Each structure stands twice: as C-alpha cells, then as structure tokens.
Amino acid sequence: MELKIKHDGALSVIELFGSINSGNAQEFEAALAGEPSGADGMLIDADGLEFISSAGLRVLLSAKKRCKAKTFRIINVSNEVMNVFDVTGFSEIMDITRAVRKLTVEGCDKIGAGACGEVFRLDDETIIKLYYPRVKKEEIELEKALAKKAFVMGVPTAISYDIVEADGRTGVVYELIKSKTIGELIRGDEAHLEDYVSLYADVCRHIHSIEALPGQLPSFKDINRADIPNVTGVTDAERSYLHRFLDLVPETLNCLHGDLNINNIMVQNGECCLIDMGEFSTGTPMFDLSRILFSMELAGAPRGEFNHFYKMPQDTVDRVLHLFFEKYFGCPLEEAEKNHPEAAWLYPLAWFRCCTSLLKGDRWGEEKRAMALDILRTKLIPYVDAQDK
C-alpha cells in the first residue's frame, strides 16, 4: 500500500495505491488518524486502490465516525473495489462513487444532436450521449438516474449503462435502439400515418397510466417553476402571473416524460421506446399533452408551409396533432373536455409553455416572442384573473 496526503483548503485529500489488508491496515489507520481534527473532512481518492480487505474497511469506518457530520467521500473507485463496498453494505452508509470509464468518439459515427449534446454510435450494441461542456454533471447524473427509474417503473425506454468521459466531455452510454422515430416513420411512409399515430397515442396513455409514489420523482410543476426566472422581456407583475398560474394547476402523481414529441419515440419491432428522459417526473398528463399542442400548433409553421422542426409540411403536422388527440381521448379535441374535464387545462398549459419557451433566450426570434407576449397578456393573465374571482 502507498498513500499520498495533500490538502485542498481545509479538506484532507488522501490518494490510495495498491492493496489494503490486515498486513498494512494499522499503517493506514495511523495515517488517517494523523489528519488534524479541525479539517473540514476527508476525501479519499481510490483511483489507484486495487483491493481492500475487511481490516481496511474497518479503518474507513473509524475515519468516517471521526469526521461526524463533516465531509467523508470516497471517489474514483474501480469496479472490483466497488463490488467489495456493495457486498459489505459500505456503499449504503458512505458516499462512494465509481471511477469514470474513459472513452473516445474519434472515428465514431455521429447519429444525432440536440439541445444538450450529441449522440455517437460506439459499436453495434451501444451509443453514447455526449453532453456539451455547459451541461452540469449533476444534470447528467440526474438524467441517467431518471432513465433507470423509468425503466424499472415499466416505462419503455433505452437501457442506460454508465457515465463516462470521452475526449474531455461527460457522456452516458445507452443501448443502441436499432429503429426509427415515429417522426421518421411518418415522413417515410405517410400512407401508414394513422397506424403510427395510434402507436404514439398508445405509448403516451401507457406512461400516464403509471403512478409514482410521493417523492419518488421530481414534480414537473417544480421543474416549470424553476424555469420562470429565465423568461425575459416581461414585467415583475407579469412574471408573478406565471407563478400564480402554476399554483392553480392540479398536482397528481402520474408519470410524465416532459417532451413527448414524435422525435423522442423510437419504434422497434412494433413497440415504442422513449429517449431523452431528463424531465421524467410527475404531474397532470395535460402537461405532456399541452407541450405536444404547443410544439405542433402554437410554435408550428403557418399552414401550407414547411415545419422545419418536424421536417414535414405543417399540414401533415396538423393532421398528426388532431388524429393524436382523437386517439388519446377517444373523441376529437374539440369534444375532449366534455368527457375528460382535465382537458380544460390543455390550452392554458400550452399558453404557459409559450411564455417559458418562446420568451427564453434568442432561439425563436422577434416574431415568436411577440406572439408569446400577446398570449401572456391577452390569454394567460385574463385566465388567471378569472380563476381568482
């Protein structure tokens, strides 16, 4: 065993190398005990640790007890050593993280890109979603954790593997779904559009039929509330209406995807599989449906023109939208509220989405911003005032 001790501010950082066993556990204990009690805590870098026995585990347990409420973390743990921590239960009582596997995407085919990162094919079985540097690691870890939860809860989604580092960026490895999105299928085979929209409605209903336990998933209402400060070009009073509107929205525990557009649903052997699970959460299903309404209608192209987001004529997008709601609700959208009172939230939630999406950043341009401001002032604010009476 070899160890190196350095200090990051008042935090003791211990780098471990080799094996820790009964023959050197006392030396290990003496080194840890020599760290000043006034330190902010202890960070153990196990990148070079090859093995640890029960004697070494007990030394770690004693060190953690000495730290009390202060920081005590073990990082960069190999799979072999992590197995020891898992089997013994230490991973449940200590803050322990695995070492990040290092890869390269040099020579790999780039098969997609989105707002948060790019997707590369690693091999015939796996892909890597490689995030842009601006995306925080905590957000990446959350998306992976949510994808795993979704899979366990019965939501059809791609199997996620590990968080890795590739060419200086962080990524997540997923199984490769050898299929096309519903959007691609519609564009390539419009004669079967109704069949594809039926799959679309079926998978949406399935997700919304799954209920989470309280606290099991983030609240989509909270996710939306956190986005309100990013809205620009509105007065403080107008911004307060966005908060007041969310206060009115019913809170339920139905599972939501957060962005159920036809480009986020793959079809493999006649079954749907969801991708991009970063906003997997709970709330009224009308949140998901209102985002579909927003992206296809309110943020869509003028009729007769080409919709560049969906890569098809706007007339086809309109057909998909109305057919989708008819299959989801079992009746045309115009009649949905009669049999499904919760459908009354569809347009108000779509107006809200207009504000939080079109008034954020400069992606949409002045014409869309003007439309969103008009919707806020002539539709959403009067709606909130009417509910308060």
Predicted feature locations:
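Conserved N-terminal boundary motif of the eukaryotic protein kinase catalytic domain
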Residues: 102-110
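Amphipathic alpha-helical interaction surfaces in cytosolic regulatory modules
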Residues: 20-94
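Active-site Asp-x-Gly
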Residues: 268-318
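Active-site acidic catalytic loop and adjacent metal/ATP-binding pocket
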Residues: 109, 118-122, 242-287
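An alpha-helical support segment within catalytic cores of ATP-dependent transferases
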Residues: 209-258, 262, 268, 388
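Helix-rich C-terminal or lid/interface subdomains of diverse kinases
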Residues: 307-389
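ATP-binding pocket architecture of kinase catalytic cores
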Residues: 109-110, 115-215, 250
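Short beta-strand/loop segment at the start of cytosolic alpha/beta domains
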Residues: 1-15
